[in-house]
Structures are given as C-alpha cells and as structure tokens.
C-alpha cells in the first residue's frame, strides 16, 4: 500500500477524523474528496455516508510519518506499510462488522483496538 503520501490535515480542529482501520488522520472534507489512501476498498469518496462508518473523531494523539518503512515508531504502531502522512496513536472504536467483512473480502488485515 501507499507509496504516494497521504494528504495531511488542512486543519487541526474538531473536524479531524481518523480511519478506524489504518488510523490515518484527515479532515472530514478530505476523506469525502479523496477517501483513505490506505483503504481504497472502502470507497468512501464514492459513498459519503460511509465516512461516518469507517472514521471517528475520537482518537488519542497524532504522529506524522514521513518515511514509515524506516521508522521504528511506525513499526511499533503497526503503520510502517502505510502511506506517509499523519496518524493517530490510538482509536477507541471498533470498525463496524459490515466494514470488517469488506476488509476480509479485500484480504486486508483489520486489528481491532485493544480497549473499546
């Protein structure tokens, strides 16, 4: 996944959301316009109602990754194979079952948060 960098958030206010699968952080409008660079199989740029299903405004911390493949922090957070960009340290919500099924169909691993 992701050689090209993901969009960085254009604002760091309350409109930020994090992808529940890969934890990429962008604004609602950025997810609406271009989807999630790491999770194209969700097709959220085509189905705007899905943004609420696969992203959350409830997350802890942000880390920016310029070269995730070489970063020990990216490996520790399990985001080393994702596109360079801004990621949350943790999300507290699980991906809905329907979206987990989409991950299975796409043969993409989903690791739910440890504490919900």
From Swiss-Prot:
Query: Any idea which GO molecular function terms this record carries?
Result: zinc ion binding
Return any one Pfam family short name: Spt4
Q: Name one GO cellular component term.
A: nucleus
Q: Which InterPro entries match?
A: RPABC4/Spt4 (IPR029040), Spt4 (IPR009287), Spt4/RpoE2_Znf (IPR022800), Spt4_sf (IPR038510)
Question: Where does the record locate the signal sequence feature?
Answer: none
Main localisation, per the record?
A: nucleus
One BP term from GO:
regulation of DNA-templated transcription
Protein localization: Nucleus
Q: Where are the zinc fingers (C4-type)?
A: 19-39
Q: Which UniProt keywords apply?
A: Activator, Metal-binding, Nucleus, Repressor, Transcription, Transcription regulation, Zinc, Zinc-finger
Give the superkingdom in one word: Eukaryota
What this chain does, per the entry, is described as: May regulate transcription elongation by RNA polymerase II. May enhance transcriptional pausing at sites proximal to the promoter, which may in turn facilitate the assembly of an elongation competent RNA polymerase II complex.
Family membership? Belongs to the SPT4 family.
PANTHER family (alphabetical): SUPPRESSOR OF TY 4, TRANSCRIPTION ELONGATION FACTOR SPT4
Q: What is this protein called?
A: Transcription elongation factor SPT4 homolog 1
Q: Which organism is it from?
A: Arabidopsis thaliana (Mouse-ear cress)
């Amino acid at each position: 996944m992701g050689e090209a960098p993901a969009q960085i958030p254009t604002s760091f206010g309350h409109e930020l959301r994090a992808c529940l699968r890969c934890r990429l952080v962008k604004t609602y409008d950025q997810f609406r316009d271009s989807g999630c660079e790491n999770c194209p199989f969700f097709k959220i740029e085509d189905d705007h109602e899905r943004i609420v299903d696969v992203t959350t405004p409830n997350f802890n911390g942000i880390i920016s990754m310029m070269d995730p493949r070489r970063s020990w922090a990216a490996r520790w957070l399990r985001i080393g194979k994702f596109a360079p960009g801004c990621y949350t340290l943790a999300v507290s919500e699980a991906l809905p079952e329907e979206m987990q099924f989409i991950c299975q169909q796409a043969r993409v691993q989903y690791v739910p948060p440890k504490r919900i």
